[in-house]
C-alpha cells in the first residue's frame, strides 16, 4: 500500500484537513467547526473527526502534521489565544490515537514553510509572511530556515501592542494588533456600529450569534462600496 499523509490547519473557527499521496497531491479534503468555546477535549474530538473522515483504505496513513495558532513546544500547545488549549499535549495524543508520527507547529510558521517550499517563496533565502484569520499570525524565514525564536513565535505580530488602551485581546493584553484587525475584531467592530444604527450589507449575517465575517464577504462589500465596510477595513 502507498503511504498517505494528513495535514491539518487548526484554527479558532474551523479545522481544515487534507489527505495527500506520496507526491504531495491532494486526494481529498475535509472541514469541521473548531467549537473552540466548548473545551479542549471537544476541540480534540473535532480534530479527530476531520482525520477520520480523511482516512482512506487505499493507502497507509504514514504521518499527521498540524498547524496550530499559539506557542508550541515539542508538540505541546503551551498557549493558544483562540483555542482553549493550554499546556495541551496534542502531538502525544495524536500519536496515541493513530499510532503514526505526528508533527505540530505554529500555524503561521508551517504556512510560511509551505509557501517557501512550494509556493511563491520558493528559492528565497529570506521571507516574511503574515496571515489574517480568526487571529493574526506571522512567520519568518532567515537564511533558508524558519526563525521561531525561543518559543517559536518570533513572527507573531498579532500580539504586538499597537493601542495600549485598546480592546482586550484573547491573550489577556489590551490593544494587540489581533484585537484590532483580525476578522474576529473586524466582526466585533461591525456589530458595534450596527448596534448604533449604522447601515451595512452585513446586517443579516451579523444577526447570527457567534458569526465571524468571511474574507470573501469583506472583499465583495469593499469593492462594492459598502461605506461602513470601507471605513472599517481601511482602519484595520
Where on the chain are the PLM-derived regions?
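Glycine-rich phosphate-binding loop and adjoining helix at the ATP-binding site
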Residues: 36, 40-48, 52, 59-64, ...
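Residue-level signal for inorganic ion chemistry
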Residues: 17, 66, 94, 186
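Adenine-nucleotide phosphate-binding core of ATP-dependent small-molecule kinases
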Residues: 30-31, 35-59, 177-179, 187-236
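Glycine-rich phosphate-binding loop of actin/hexokinase-like ATP-binding domains
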Residues: 120-180
